[in-house]
Curated annotation (Swiss-Prot):
Identification of the protein by name: Elongation factor P
The species this protein was found in: Pectobacterium carotovorum subsp. carotovorum (strain PC1)
Gene Ontology biological process terms in this record: peptide biosynthetic process
The keyword Cytoplasm is annotated on this UniProt entry: yes
Gene designation: efp
Residues the record lists as N6-(3,6-diaminohexanoyl)-5-hydroxylysine modifications: K34
GO CC annotations, alphabetized: cytoplasm
Amino acid sequence: MATYSSNDFRSGLKIMFEGEPYAIESSEFVKPGKGQAFARVKMRRLLTGSRVEKTFKSTDSAEGADVVDTNMNYLYNDGEFYHFMHPETFEQHQVEEKTVGDSAKWLQDNAECIVTLWDGRAIAVQPPNFIEAEITDTDPGLKGDTAGTGGKPATLSTGAVVKVPLFVQIGEVVRVDTRSGEYVSRVK
């Protein structure tokens, strides 16, 4: 892989740091009046998702991470692993439950997800930005009951719970933003 100087660090760049892949979220180059220049970097550890702040000298460098984001279709969950398939090569990957994490509540059969692979192993799963799911459970909205925020919790067919407007009923299909977990619209 390529080697990057700390001057080349940009948002979105994936590097190897302490033997693990990291994604740089922001980089600020600082040149103090006295002393050596440095880069103040905020990065996300791809294996766990934790965020780290690190300072690199201007002479430091890091190797690029051999990390690939691949579009894959979600197939099924066998209780222990989530199974994904590449749509063109039909190559299948099984992903541990802890790697999928909170994304599991947004997975629907055959949904196209972005699976991040490192050394052929899946290390992160990103569900589609928007899903359409049926409401399986919610309280009936009473007319004139808008004293509060005007929303009510609803359980989707995927198991996720989102806040929806009072007019939405059981059996309706709604569009949800998976990044924020918010209701977007009804699907007709």
